[in-house]
Design a protein with these regions (language model features):
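A generic beta-sheet turn/junction motif
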Residues: 40, 128-132, 141, 164-168, ...
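Short, glycine-/polar-rich solvent-exposed loops and beta-turns at beta-strand/coil boundaries
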Residues: 18, 36-41, 151-154, 442-445
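Short acidic/polar hinge/loop motifs at secondary-structure boundaries
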Residues: 2-28
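Outer-membrane beta-barrel "beta-signal"
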Residues: 427-431
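Surface-exposed loop/interface segments of Gram-negative outer-membrane beta-barrel transport/assembly proteins
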Residues: 54-106, 147, 151, 157, ...
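A beta-strand signature from Gram-negative outer-membrane beta-barrel systems
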Residues: 18-60, 119-121, 142-145
Length: 524
């Protein structure tokens, strides 16, 4: 929610070591959907990773250091002091009190809360091999400290790739593996309650910020440190001392991810080959959130001793395909590029959380120290599988006129118990290169005119067509009531017409423009 925010972790693409990337390209339109399924209905980003090169072994070492400071912050008023409606108040988060004279101004800026961040990146790569076998290995470490106090990010990458050419170069084996360890603390999210920037930005201009830097005070009666924040919670904002949020409401993620990719290609003729691939991508994660005693009561569920959350997740992604590829030119006029294949995608996710207020000794963060009567143990999980058949066919004439058609049929598990067990999405396109037909000037050397029609489908969300029984934490069991299945659901479909052109001119400038119309049906 907007109030509580999220865990603030990174996207999976951020796990990659930039030094392992050879190139990045973008595939758009129906071609992306035909080869990669409905997940690529809006396009696909293709990342090609490096592999070994024949020749002497090469070792590259790189080190990079970056420092970070905010480029610009919002402008804040410093004319009015602590209070509301022009009246001074001694304990409030508002800064619209009585006007301040120059001597009473502390000249506070949110930049006083921020710190200079840095990113240290170190990597080592090794590459080499023979004409028949090439290897590539890399390791990298990213260690970062953010702008917000107690914000850290550490990632360690290990990558290996081996490419072999066998049977007189007719058989190619390509195997790679990656292992990624990531640990982060207090990644900033968009919520209010767990975001220290809210109270740092709204700190009253008539108060002395240096006083709240000592964010906790020792309570000899309770024998614990308590939060110091005389400004109050600001009503529904539930604000706390920003340093208390950073150091006494820590959120930590620990992820271990390993990926394996294996590919085999057999060249039947010079213009035909068959290829198979398998990719496994597994992630184990641990998320913890520690809320110390005297944090905001709303977050603590009115506990006087603190609250603890521990979530363990497991994600399993498996993909495999087999494809027949043809690329041939006939009589130096006609060309044929075709891909025919089948694929399977299997995704699984399981997550178990344990959270609740602390019942025993304050600020001892362990699941055995939680209040048994209020402890929650929600478990979530799902399993999806899509089996597909696809093709892509392009006919060319003199490398200037092309007709393309694609098609894909998906059997998705989300369609269980629905009237339609699979869905087919085709496309047709025509493109012409006037720059190849006519003699264009050197300064305007490329022009492509294109037109296409495509019909792309997506399955509806899982579990809509089957009865489900939600887990009820209040009774520590399954609810007798079930979510009634929706029977008459059909896959979402978008039909698109597109006209456009691509041009290159003046030795490096490119221009692309498109007109399109898209109509979507069966939205859920």
């Amino acid at each position: 929610s907007m109030e509580f925010g999220s865990r603030g972790t990174t996207e999976s693409i951020a796990d990659m070591n930039p030094d392992d990337i050879e190139s990045i390209s973008v595939m758009t339109g129906a071609a992306a959907a035909a080869l990669y399924g409905s997940d690529a209905a809006n396009g696909a980003m293709l990342i090609t990773t490096k592999k070994g090169k024949a020749g002497a072994t090469q070792i590259q070492v790189s080190s990079n250091t970056e420092f970070m400071n905010p480029l610009r912050l919002p402008d804040f008023q410093t004319r009015y002091g602590t209070g509301r409606k022009g009246k001074a108040s001694g304990s409030t988060i508002h800064s619209w009190g009585a006007p301040l004279n120059q001597a009473a101004r502390y000249n506070y800026s949110p930049e006083d809360f921020l710190q200079t961040g840095h990113i240290l990146t170190n990597s080592v790569t090794l590459s080499g091999g023979t004409e028949k076998n090439q290897i590539y290995f890399s390791t990298a470490a990213v260690n970062s400290k953010g702008l917000v106090p107690n914000n850290k990010y550490n990632r360690y990458n290990f990558t290996f790739r081996n490419t072999s050419n066998l049977l007189n170069d007719r058989l190619t084996l390509d195997v790679s593996g990656s292992y990624i360890i990531q640990k982060d603390r207090n990644m900033i999210n968009q919520g209010v309650y767990s975001n220290p920037l809210v109270s740092a930005y709204l700190f009253p201009r008539g108060d002395d910020f240096s006083l709240v830097k000592a964010f906790e005070r020792w309570n000899p009666a309770r024998k614990i440190y308590e939060q110091f924040w005389p400004q109050g919670e600001g009503g529904d904002l539930r604000m706390q001392n920003p340093y208390w949020i950073a150091y006494r409401n820590p959120r930590e993620n620990s992820r271990k991810r390993y990926m394996f990719t294996g590919g085999i290609t057999y060249k039947i003729t010079d213009w035909m080959n068959v290829a198979g691939r398998i990719r496994v991508d597994n992630t184990n994660s641990l998320y913890t959130e520690k809320l110390y005693a005297t944090s905001n009561p709303t977050l603590l569920e009115n506990s006087k001793k603190g609250k603890y959350t521990e979530t363990r997740g497991e994600e399993r992604q498996t993909y495999g395909d087999v494809m027949l590829n043809l690329s041939k030119t006939f009589k130096e006029k006609f060309s044929l590029d075709a891909h025919i294949g089948a694929s399977i995608k299997d995704n699984r996710f399981d997550e178990l959380s344990v959270y609740g207020p602390i019942a025993g000794a304050p600020n001892i963060f362990n699941v055995v120290n939680l209040d048994k009567s209020q402890k929650k143990t929600p478990k979530t999980g799902w399993h999806e599988q899509t089996q597909s058949f696809f093709y892509s066919l392009e006919l060319g004439w003199k490398s200037q006129l092309f007709v393309t058609t694609t098609g894909r049929n998906d059997w998705a598990s989300q369609l269980a118990n629905s009237p339609q067990k699979s869905f087919f999405y085709p496309s047709v396109g025509v493109s012409w290169l006037p720059s190849s037909t006519f003699n264009f000037p050197e300064k305007f050397n490329y022009l492509k005119i294109r037109a296409s029609w495509a019909s792309v489908a997506n399955p509806f969300p899982r579990e809509l067509t089957i009865a489900t029984h939600p887990y009820d934490d209040t009774i520590s069991g399954w609810d007798d009531k079930s979510n009634y299945p929706i029977g008459q659901l059909y896959p979402e479909r978008t039909k698109t017409w597109e006209l456009g052109f691509d041009a290159r001119f003046l030795h490096g400038f490119t221009l692309s423009a498109s007109w399109y119309r898209a109509d979507t049906y069966n939205q859920t």
